Amino acid sequence: MGLVSKVVPLADLPAAARAYAEDICSCGPLAVQAIKQSVYRGGRMTLAEHLKYEQQLASEVFMSEDAHEGLAAFREKRKPRWKLR
């Protein structure tokens, strides 16, 4: 299920948590928002409902201006300029 992705010594935990958070923050905000919505609402749905909901969220994200910007930035080897649209 992927709930644990890394184990670090307790002394290294703050730095590892910050690095993980920075990695998430570098992703497209609409995609991160959709993932959070899926996790929060998914626990109250059947599997079939959740899969349909995820498909709807993914379609919205993939059709967004930010999705096109992310692909363009990747092709042009630059940081994306997110617009939240």
Model-found features: residue ranges?
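Active-site-proximal glycine-rich helix-loop-beta segment
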Residues: 1-3, 78
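Terminal low-complexity tails and localization/encapsulation signals of metabolic enzymes
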Residues: 72-85
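Short acidic-aromatic low-complexity motifs
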Residues: 68-69
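C-terminal long alpha-helix characteristic of the crotonase
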Residues: 4-52, 60, 65, 82-85
